[in-house]
C-alpha cells in the first residue's frame, strides 16, 4: 500500500532523515518508533506531503506521490492525525467531525462514517453540541481520530495519539486503533509508548538519528535486547 524509498528530508540546512525506507501492506498496523528527535514526525509529515522530500520517492497504492499536494494525498485515502490533536476549539464536536468529510467521496458517505465514529466514541454523541475546546484531553484525541475517520481513509497515520493522556484513556485509544484496523483501515502508528504500540502491530520500524536502525515483527521487536535496554528500561 505505502512504500517509502530512501528519502532524505531537511529543515533548512539541517538534514533530519537519511535514506529512510519502509513499507506498509494493506490492512496492517505498523509502528514507527524512536525517541524524541529521532525523526518520526518528520517522516510522517513527508509521507502526508506537509514536508518536501529532497531525494527519494514515496508511493501510495502504486502511485508516485512524492510531489503530490497534501490535499491530493487525502483524496487518495492517506489521512494523518497530527500530534497535539489540532481540533477547531471554537467549533462544536459535530462541526469538527463534518470538517473531516469535506471531500466529495467522504461527503457522500458522511452519515455512515458518522455512525461508525459514534460507535467507537459514544461520548462524542453526548458532546456533539459542545464546543471542542471545552473537551478533556482524551475526548479531544477521540474527536481528532473521529475527524480523520470522517475522511474515509485507506491509510490512517496517527502521530503520538497517547501523548499526555491518562493510562486508562491510552488503553482505550489503543483498543480503538485495533477496531479501526479490523474494519479494513491500514494504520501507521507513531508512538513513544513502545510496548503498547508493538503489542498491537504486525511490524515495526525504529528510527535513530534520522535513519531506520531496526525493523521486524512487533513481537520480535518487543523481545529485542536493544529495544528492551534503550526504550523499555529492562
Each predicted region: which residue ranges?
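ABC ATPase C-loop
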Residues: 148-149
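Conserved ABC ATPase signature
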Residues: 131-135, 139
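ABC ATPase NBD coupling module
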Residues: 52, 64-84, 107-114, 126-129, ...
Amino acid at each position: 500500500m505505502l512504500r517509502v524509498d530512501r528519502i532524505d528530508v531537511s529543515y533548512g540546512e539541517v538534514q533530519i532523515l537519511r535514506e529512510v525506507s519502509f513499507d506498509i501492506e494493506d490492512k496492517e498496523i505498523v509502528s514507527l518508533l524512536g525517541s524524541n528527535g529521532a525523526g518520526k514526525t518528520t517522516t510522517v509529515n513527508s509521507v502526508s506531503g506537509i514536508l518536501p522530500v529532497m531525494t527519494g520517492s514515496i508511493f501510495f497504492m502504486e502511485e508516485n506521490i512524492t510531489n503530490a499536494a497534501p490535499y491530493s494525498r487525502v483524496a487518495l485515502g492517506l489521512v494523518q492525525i497530527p500530534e497535539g490533536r489540532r481540533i477547531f476549539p471554537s467549533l462544536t464536536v459535530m462541526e469538527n467531525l463534518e470538517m473531516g468529510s469535506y471531500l466529495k467521496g467522504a461527503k457522500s458517505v458522511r452519515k455512515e462514517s458518522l455512525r461508525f465514529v459514534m460507535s467507537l466514541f459514544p461520548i462524542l454523541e453526548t458532546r456533539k453540541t459542545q464546543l471542542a475546546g471545552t473537551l478533556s484531553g482524551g475526548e479531544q484525541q477521540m474527536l481528532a481520530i473521529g475527524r480523520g475517520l470522517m475522511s474515509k481513509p485507506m491509510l490512517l497515520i496517527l502521530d503520538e495519539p497517547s501523548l499526555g493522556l491518562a493510562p486508562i484513556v491510552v488503553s482505550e485509544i489503543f483498543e480503538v486503533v485495533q477496531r479501526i484496523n479490523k474494519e479494513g483501515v491500514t494504520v501507521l502508528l507513531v508512538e513513544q509508548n513502545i510496548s503498547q504500540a508493538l503489542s498491537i502491530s504486525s511490524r515495526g520500524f525504529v528510527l535513530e538519528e534520522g535513519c531506520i536502525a531496526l525493523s521486524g515483527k512487533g513481537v520480535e521487536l518487543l523481545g529485542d535486547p536493544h529495544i528492551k535496554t534503550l526504550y523499555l528500561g529492562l
